[in-house]
Amino acid sequence: MDPNNKVSINKNMGLLRKCLCHDEYNKKRFCYSRFHHKTLLYKQLYEISKILRRLNSGLDMWCLRDAIISALGAMHDAPHVDRLLGQFYLKTNSASEFDSISLILESENILQKELIEFVRDSKVELEKILQAAIHVWRAKFSPGVLAASRFLDEISNSFNGIEENIPTIFLRISVTLASQIKKIEYLQKSFVSHKCPLVEEILILLYKRVCMLPFPCMSNLGLVSEKKSVFDTVFHNVSNFSLEDFLDINSGFFLPAMLNGSYVSVNLTRYHYEAESLMELLLSQLQIVEKDTNKTTGLTIYLEIWHLSLLMWLDFCEILPTTVQVKFCLILPEIFMERLKTENSYWSVFHKALAINLGLYDESDFTSKYLECERTAEHARIKTETLLDNICRCLRRGQMGFIFRKNIHKYSMLPQIASYCLGNSMDVIPFEYGLNTAFRIALNLSYFVENVSEEQKSHTNIDMFHYRDKIFNLKKMRKTVTELVLIGNAVIDYALENRDFLMDGIVNARSLAICVTGLHSALMSMNLPFNSQLGCQLYRIVCENIYYSSVRTSMNCCKKGAEPCSFFQRSKYAQGILHCDLYDNVEYTLPNVLWTNLRSDIKKYGLRNLTFVSGSAMSKEFDLLNCSQSFCPIEGNKILKRSSIKVLHPNPVFHSDLSVYSTELQTLYIPVYNGLFLNRFKNHLEYLSSVNYDVSKVNKNLFSEEEMQEMTIFLNAFDYSVNEMLNMYVGALPFTDHGQANVFFINKTENMRDILVCLYQNGFKTGIYQAVYKNQKCDGVNPSKKFDLLSGFSDGVVMSTMHVFQ
C-alpha cells in the first residue's frame, strides 16, 4: 500500500478522495482518463478516439456513456458498455486491482477490531470463498453502472485512501454478520445445520442478488463510528413537545438520522403557528444532506385529521416542489370514513390542546369522545367533500398517504399500544410516545423463478408453484427467509451491542420487515399476467410462506435460548393468536397442522420479534437487485437506467410524443429488464423501432394470434383498474403484518372517495402511499436535466413512455 495514497479528511466536507491516476485530490469518484480505447474491445477505435479528445474533467459519466454508445451505433452493445463502465469506473468486478482481504486488514483505524481479527484468523478460508464467489458474480449478476454508482455513493467509505469497491463491501458485511452470529448462542445453533461456512452463505445471498440490506446497514456495519446507525427507518413522536424541545431534538436526533441516510418520520400535527418555521428548518436540513453528502434521505410528516392545523399543512403539501423528498400522511379515524360515505356531511377540527387530548383516546373510544367535543367544545367545520378535494390535490402530486386508525386498532398485534406508521413506505409499527425503528430486508422474488426440471415435476404444491414450463420455488424461498430473519436478528443484536444511536427504538418489539420485492418481475418471467387469477394466487401464497417461515424462525430463536422480545407478553401472540387469525375467511395453502403447531409453540416458547412481512418497497435498495421495485407494475427512473438497456435506431420521420430521446443522441432507448420482449419478437425490430409500443394498436397483421395473446402480459400500469389491483392486495393482507403501502394508478373515471372507502372496508392499515393520476403523469419533468432516459410508469417493457427531451 502506497503510504502517500492516504485519504484527507475535512470535517466540513467529508472525504477528499485521492485520484488513483493523478497525484491530486479530487472529490469526484470517477477519473475519466482511465477510460481509453485500449480498454474497449470494439473495432470503431477511430470514432472513440474522437470522443476521447473531447473529454474534459467536468464531463458527466452519462455523457461519456451515451457518446460511446452513439459512436458505436450500438444496437446491442449498451449493456456491455454499461458493464465496462461499471468495472473500470466503479470497480464492481470481482477481479479488482485492490485485494478486498488486504484492504480490510490494513484498515484498523476504520474497522472494528473483532472484524479485523476474524479476517486475519480466517484469511485462507476467505480467499477460497471469494474465489468461489467470482464464479457467482457473472455478468448477469453484476449491477448496471447507475445502480452501482448509487450504491457506492450511498456507502461512500474510503479505506486508507482507497474507495471501497462492491466486493469489499459484501465481504465486510458478511464477515461482520458471521462474527456476530458466532458470538450469539441462539443464532449459532440456528445456523448449525447449514453445510457451507457462514461467510459464504451470506456472501452468496448478496452476490446472487437474492436480498439486499438497507443502505445505512451496508454502509456502517463493521465500522468504528459515532452517530451512525444500521437502521434506515425511524419514527419519533414529537406531538407533545414544545417548539424549544423540538429544536433541541432536531439537532441531536433528526439531523444525524438524515445524515445517516435514514428515513425520518415525525408527527407534527400539534404545531400550528410554528408550522412555517418548522418546514423551513426541515427542508433546509434535507438540502444540507443532499448538497454536502452522498446520502439520500426522506421525511414523512404525519397529520391527525381532527387538528385545526390540518389545512395549513395541506397548503404546505400543495406548494412543495415534487422533487423534495417529503411525504405527508393523514391519520383517518373511523368516524371520518363513515362521514366520507355520506353526501353533504361536515368534518370538525379542534384547537391544539383539545385535539392533542382527543388523539390520546383509543379508537374504540375515539368516536364517542369526538362527538362529545363537537357538541360541547369550540371547533371549526369544513365540508367533507371540500376537504377531500384538498387531499386529492396533494395525492395528484404524489405526496400524500393515509392510515386507517380503526384497522390499525383492529388488526394490530399490540392492542394496548397506540400504533402509527414508519418510514418512506408507511410501515406499521407500535410505539409509546417515543422512538421506534425497524430493520428491513428486501427479498428478490424473481430469484426463485426456475425452469421445470424432471425432479421438480414430482414435488407437491407446497414446495413448488407450477405454471407451464416455469416454477416458483417456494421451498427455496422459505429457506432463504429463515436465513434473513436470523441475519436481521444478528443486525439488531449488533446495534444494541455497539450502542447504535437509534437502538432505543428497536428494543421492545425488535421489528423486522421482509420486504416483498420483484413480484412483477417474477410474474413476467413466468409469463403470468399481473392481474390474472393465478398471479393473485401466487402473490398470496408467497406472502403466506414468508409470514409462516418468519414467525417459525423467530419462535425457534426463543426455543434455542433467546429471550422473547419485551412486548411479547403484551401482544396477541402470547395468546396463541397469529396476524392471519385477525382476518375472516383466510385462504391457506400450507397444511393446517403447521399453523396449529406454530400457535402452540409460540405460546410455549415466545417470539424474538413482533413484526415480519412488509408489502412495501425499499426504494433505494431494489435497484441493485435488478428487479421491479414492488408488486405493482411501476418502474421509475432508477430501475430503467442500468445495464439491461437495449438500443434501437430511431425512425427519422416518426417522432411520437410517447417516445423518449436523449438530448444529444436522438436515439430511442427501450429498457427491457428481463430481455423477454425483444427476445420473443426479435423478428419485428423494424416494426418496434417505428411505433410507440401502444399495445392497443398492435393487430394480427403484425403478430400471430399466439404472439398477440402473449403480448397481453405487457400492459401499462394505467391499463389495470384499481379494483383489479385491490383484488391482488387483499388476498395477502392477513400475511403482511408490517407494511401495506401501495401505489395506485388512477384513471379519470375512478372516484377517489370510492377507492378510500374500499381500502378501509377491506382491512388495509395503510392506504395509498402514492396515487398516480393519468392526466398528471408528466408533472415534475425537468427538460434541462440531461439523459433522464426514461421517466414514468410501465411494467418493465416500455409500451407507453412519456417524455421527449428536445
From Swiss-Prot:
GO terms for biological process: deoxyribonucleotide biosynthetic process. Gene3D superfamilies: 3.20.70.20. It comes from the Viruses. GO terms for molecular function: ATP binding; ribonucleoside-diphosphate reductase activity, thioredoxin disulfide as acceptor. The keyword RNA-binding does not apply. Pfam families: Ribonuc_red_lgC, Ribonuc_red_lgN. Keywords: Host cytoplasm, Late protein, Virion. InterPro entries: HSV_RIR1_betahv (IPR034716), NrdE_NrdA_C (IPR013346), RNR_lg_C (IPR000788), RNR_lsu_N (IPR013509), Rrm1 (IPR039718). GO terms for cellular component: host cell cytoplasm; virion component. It is found in: Virion; Host cytoplasm. PANTHER family: RIBONUCLEOSIDE-DIPHOSPHATE REDUCTASE LARGE CHAIN, RIBONUCLEOSIDE-DIPHOSPHATE REDUCTASE LARGE SUBUNIT. HAMAP family: HSV_RIR1_betahv. Belongs to the ribonucleoside diphosphate reductase large chain family. Does not possess a ribonucleotide reductase activity. Betaherpesviruses probably use another strategy to expand the dNTP pool in a quiescent host cell. This is Ribonucleoside-diphosphate reductase large subunit-like protein. The gene is RIR1.
